Amino acid sequence: MTSNQITIALTKGRIEKDAVTLLEKAGFNMSFMADKGRNLIFESPDNRFRFLLVKAPDVTTYVRHGVADIGIVGKDVLVEHPTGYLEMLDLNFGLCKFCVASTEDYNPNDHKRKRIATKYPTIATDYFNQKGEDVEIISIQGSVEIAPVIGLADAIVDIVETGSTLVANGLKVYEDICRISARMIVNKASLKNNKEVLQFIRKIESLVGNEEVPFE
């Protein structure tokens, strides 16, 4: 690894694929990642870049500890893990939204104390606090869609892309919370000490056409 090599942590899966496409549009040759196999670490032939394929929640950890200079990850992860990095760009892919969803008999205007199941306790808590509603948050790591169906919760807060999974489980969206997309984050020291990092970010910024978009 060269001293100015940029290490980028990518969220495995759809965000990874969209990120590679974006980098190709920016003029970078990404063919070395075409045949990944089971590999999780890739270096570009010119040694300018090293890519780490990791799970979404780990992207912020790698960037925070300086193992990665840059991370590409969904805004949902940043909301739950908000410190230790700088958020630089909204990349305008990986588009989806946070929603409140439940069964047909759910009444969002019922003022009784609700139980809300979610994999995103921070966003759920903040949302209902802003509404002035007292709710019990139930953290679930697996398939949250079944929680209202089996009576564990009154409703869920989850990420919705097409809504097909909700429909398949007898749920519908009652409230939209906020839009989510892939974001570029950077290690603070890397931004300060490695000029290649800032040049890379500015090159991507010229394609996506924005600076940091605050969370709404």
Swiss-Prot record:
CDD domains registered for this protein in UniProt: PBP2_HisGs (cd13595)
Catalytic activity as recorded in UniProt: 1-(5-phospho-beta-D-ribosyl)-ATP + diphosphate = 5-phospho-alpha-D-ribose 1-diphosphate + ATP
Enzyme nomenclature, EC number: 2.4.2.17
Localization: Cytoplasm
Cellular component, GO, one term: cytoplasm
Swiss-Prot/TrEMBL keywords: Amino-acid biosynthesis, ATP-binding, Cytoplasm, Glycosyltransferase, Histidine biosynthesis, Nucleotide-binding, Transferase
Record GO terms (molecular function): ATP binding; ATP phosphoribosyltransferase activity
Disulfide bonds, paired cysteine numbers: none
NCBIfam families: hisG
HAMAP family listed in its UniProt record: HisG_Short
Comment block on domains: Lacks the C-terminal regulatory region which is replaced by HisZ.
Similarity comment: family membership: Belongs to the ATP phosphoribosyltransferase family. Short subfamily.
Protein name per the record: ATP phosphoribosyltransferase
Organism lineage string: Bacteria, Bacillati, Bacillota, Bacilli, Lactobacillales
